[in-house]
Structure formats: C-alpha cells, structure tokens
Amino acid sequence: LTPIYPSPLQDGGYDITDFKNIHPELGDLAAFHRLLTAAHDMNLKVILDLVLNHTSHLHPWFQRARWAPKGSLEREVYVWSEDPTKYADAPVLFRNFESSNWEWDEVAEQYYFHRFLHHQPDLNYENPWVQDQMLGVVDFWLERGVDGFRLDAVPFLFEAEGSRCEGLPETHDFLRKVRHRVEATGKDVLLLAEAIQPVDEAAPYLAEDELHAAFNFALTAHLFAAVASGSSKNLRFCLHEAQTLAPGSRWVLPLRNHDELWLGDGHLVSEKVIQTIRAGLHQSHGHWLNWGINRRLAPLLNGDPRANRVLHALIYSLPGMPCLYYGDELGMGDWPGLRDRDANRTPMAWTPARNGGFSVAPDPLLVLPPITAPGYDYRVVNVEVQKQLPGSLLNWHRRMLTCRRLLSALRL
C-alpha cells in the first residue's frame, strides 16, 4: 500500500502528519485491521510504504521545531542551517519544482533541508530521539500484523559534507536497527529498499543483517536501453554486476512504478545509456520530469504488446522477484496532462463500466480520472474484456506467472 497515513496530500501521501494512524478519507485503524484480516484470509500479504526520510511541514514535530530555540533538541528533530550552500554535492531530486535542497523558514529564521519537495522537511537522524521515534513507528505497525515495509528513499537518511548525501555508513547502521526490530518479532516480515542507486551502491542494503530485498533500478534502465538500441550489451553487463548477493536476499525487478522512469544525472547509469534511451524511445520533451521519463510502460513502448511480453518474460525469468505495476498486465495507458507523476497513477481499469469499475463516485469526487485516451480507453482496455480473450495480454501474463510458479528454476 502506498502511504495511507494522515496527510495534506501535497505529494500523494508521502507528506505525512501522523505515522501511526490512517488518513480519515480512507477509514481508521479498525478499517485497516479488517482489510488486513481479509487479505490474510485470502493468503495475501500486506506491505506498507514507510517514509523514513521526511515528514510534512504540517507535522506537529516540524511545527514545534520551527518555534523551538535554535540548537534545542526540539529544533534538531530536523536539519537546519544558516548556510543554504551546505551539502552542495547533494543533487536536487525534484529539479522541475525545486531550485535548492534548502528552504528558508520565517519563524525559525533558518534554512531547513529537504531532499524532496519544500513541504517535506528531512528528519535529522543524527538526533537519537528521531531514530527512537521512527523505530517506534516500525514497532507500531508490526504489532498490528503487517507483513513488511517498502522503505521509501532509504539512501537519504543522513547527510555529510562533500558527499551526495546518499547511502552513508550511518544509514546502514540505522537500517540494521530496523532489521533487529523485525527479527525480534519472530515473524516473516519483508524489508524492501527503494534505493535508486547503481548496483554496487544498492547491493550493501542486502547485507545479511540489513534488508531482505531492494529494487534494481539500474537493471530497469538497462532494459530500456536494450529496447531503445536493439543491443543487449549494457543489459549483459548489469546482469553480471548483480549476481553476488547475501544469502536469502533478493533483487526486486520493476519495469515501471508510480514515479517517473528514473534515469538520473549520470550516477545511476552512464550518460551514454541515458542518451540511448532518450533517442530510442522517442518521447517528447514534455514527457520528461525531474531526472526521468514520466510515462507508463505501454506508451513508452508505443503501445506494442510484443515489447511488453518480451520485457516481462525477462523479469519473470531473471533471478529475483518480479514487480508488476498495476495495469501493466493490461497495457494500460497514462494521462500526460495531469500534475507531476499523477499521469502514472490513474484508476485501475477493471470493467467497461463507469470509472472503469474502480468507483461509482461522480467525476468531481474522483482524485484522478480513468484513462480515455485513444488506444488506451478504459472501456476497451480493462480486466473484464481481456479475461474473455485467450490471446489477450492479461491472459499471457497469467500463463507466464503460472509457469513461474510451476518451474523452480524460474523462482531463484
């Protein structure tokens, strides 16, 4: 589940005001318990998106911090400075929206650090109180029976001058504390890292005493470079690089997700790979957002179901855990005109009925509209229609996943 916590929803719920509750528009803790119970009854596991790096600027911690005296423990819950050039080597991630990682606060009379949007101030993990609070959040949801956490933006927890402020040793120390909390429950709980880093920098998150799995975003970029160039050279290199992992740990292999297809500034993959993708996928300038391409899988592949099958056949057969973004099994499209990354976050197309069967709400109450773009209209591209067509993309995915379950060699 992407963030379900109370939030002003300025960034899709990743701007959190209370880590131990449910957004009132979604229900309450009792409703969450019912959902968890129903999922477990169907042998489904529920993983929560846990945003460790930052809060909303409306979180009570930040509101107290900005009024607290400079240098006080309450102020130091966040990262403050008099100098907005500090940590100058840390790239601005949301470069379409932010010109700096620092924002001036009139009340505090200091700058606060934010690796994400300016309304998402970074927590200060140098402060032991912050670590204790966030470990308490882990405990809270473990006690409620969740089956794991997708640890959002884990490389950014600590800062150091002269570095990119990513994947520092202190970050790994804290993640080992998280692992210890999980192990103490004696339950089978998954810790999954979102770390958009090269393979050699992402692999340390998979140490035996750290996390169980991590997304391999470098492999994703190389897959698209192979499609764009018609050559598997970069893909072979990336696969070789990803071979050695700690026992029991796994790469998670996504083709797309709810963000832009992240390519980066030449750090995740080389500038040559980035240029290959830019040239070969023929995406217009308007589809570029921050450091990547803001399209869903099907439009990236020009609506070609054969390319969809080839790429998914790869991630279903490679060592690791395939990650299927909802709708990609149908060839769902996107809404490029929507704000920020909302283009990739439209409702799932279940049926040809109103709003794709996702909701019967009137249009003004929908957070995002269903797809009606030519070639991707939800009245044509949906689960109900494709279930009835033996040769549909959906049924192809079902057959492939059945093969994966039956053949142990495909489950390494």
Region spans (language model):
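Active-site and adjacent substrate-binding regions of carbohydrate-active enzymes
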Residues: 1-412
